[in-house]
Amino acid sequence: MAAQIDLKNITVQFGQNKAVNDVSLEINKGDIYGVIGFSGAGKSTLVRTINLLQYPSAGSVEVNGTVLFKDNKLQISKKQLQEKRRKIGMIFQNFNLLNEETVIENVAFALQHSRLSDQELEKKSLHLLELVGLKDKADFYPAQLSGGQQQRVAIARALANDPDILISDEATSALDPKTTNQILDLLYDLNKKLGLTVVLITHEMDAVKRVANKIVVMEKGKVIEKGELREVFLHPQKQLTRQFVGGALQAQHILNTYNFDKLAENAELYQLVYSINDVTKSVVADLDVSLNTKASILYGNVEVLSGEPIGTLAILLNLNELKQKEAIKFLESKNVVVTKLDKGVLTND
């Protein structure tokens, strides 16, 4: 099946700086695709090439089977580009609402170029507000709403032209954790109800793991890792990805509270991550029996990743180097992802 969004060898250069450096990305219809990285990684710059709010310096952009940009030039007319852009909704950290207009008027504003009658315009705007759970706030003004409610209005407005793609550019970064989860859950519901493809730009792994099915990790303008969320989450290959995963699994809490200087000579800390569906017994108890040792459990947690329960343990092993290797091999044979915890795992450098 052809990708709904196909970015090939995208480079975006500002002067001597390559904000995006030779990035290729395929996003299928119905994906919730997380684009994650720290500030300055090139996330927003890359994603804005999808609707050509940012023209690439090199590479090609294809959306819904139409090549929009190739060979350093636009492949369709300006009018056609405007039509394509209407089918790609966007929401941002700033809600960009019209403060002097009511909620329903803010939504209807996005339909000002449509051929709908006033009655049809009102009906559609109310339907969109119902989709985001704000039909009862239609006659309110933005100042009367909470931040989360204002973002819901922005989402309703972004859906006004019946897009099949929605880009969320750090849309939850200004919200509190509870409201963030509510907005993410709304995006997930819209994805399922409308078949909406969502491109989720964020620097928070918690946001990605809550709703995304695929992920791309960016650093300094390049893609360093991408794939199915479960695979990347359970088997991170790059240091930065391990850093994001470690933070999402609260490994940072372990590192910030544990005194490494007091570890015995052979003692090592490990993070164990595993699918509850894959591991049915106590892997630590099995390890103790297998190696005739006793692992100390410092931390344990279970969280849900795209509907799948994922377990996390932080354990302390006091074994010689050979036995440490045997322990890791044993755990990995049980479908457990093992990461040695040290002060370098979660550095932001």
Swiss-Prot record:
InterPro entries with a match to the protein in the record: AAA+_ATPase (IPR003593), ABC_transporter-like_ATP-bd (IPR003439), ABC_transporter-like_CS (IPR017871), ACT-like_dom_sf (IPR045865), MetN_ABC (IPR041701), MetN_ABC_transporter-like (IPR050086), NIL_domain (IPR018449), P-loop_NTPase (IPR027417)
Record EC number: 7.4.2.11
GO annotation, cellular component aspect: plasma membrane
Keywords: Amino-acid transport, ATP-binding, Cell membrane, Membrane, Nucleotide-binding, Translocase, Transport
Domain of life: Bacteria
GO molecular function: ABC-type D-methionine transporter activity; ATP binding; ATP hydrolysis activity
Cell location: Cell membrane
Enzyme type, top EC level: translocase
Topological relation to the membrane, as annotated: Peripheral membrane protein
Residues of the ABC transporter domain: 5-245
Reactions listed under catalytic activity: L-methionine(out) + ATP + H2O = L-methionine(in) + ADP + phosphate + H(+); D-methionine(out) + ATP + H2O = D-methionine(in) + ADP + phosphate + H(+)
Amino acids binding ATP: 37-44
Similarity annotation: Belongs to the ABC transporter superfamily. Methionine importer (TC 3.A.1.24) family.
Subunit structure comment from the entry: The complex is composed of two ATP-binding proteins (MetN), two transmembrane proteins (MetI) and a solute-binding protein (MetQ).
PANTHER family reported for this sequence: AMINO ACID IMPORT ATP-BINDING PROTEIN (PTHR43166), METHIONINE IMPORT ATP-BINDING PROTEIN METN (PTHR43166:SF30)
Protein role: Part of the ABC transporter complex MetNIQ involved in methionine import. Responsible for energy coupling to the transport system.
Name of the protein this chain belongs to: Methionine import ATP-binding protein MetN
Naturally occurring in which organism (per UniProt): Lactobacillus johnsonii (strain CNCM I-12250 / La1 / NCC 533)
Lineage: Bacteria, Bacillati, Bacillota, Bacilli, Lactobacillales
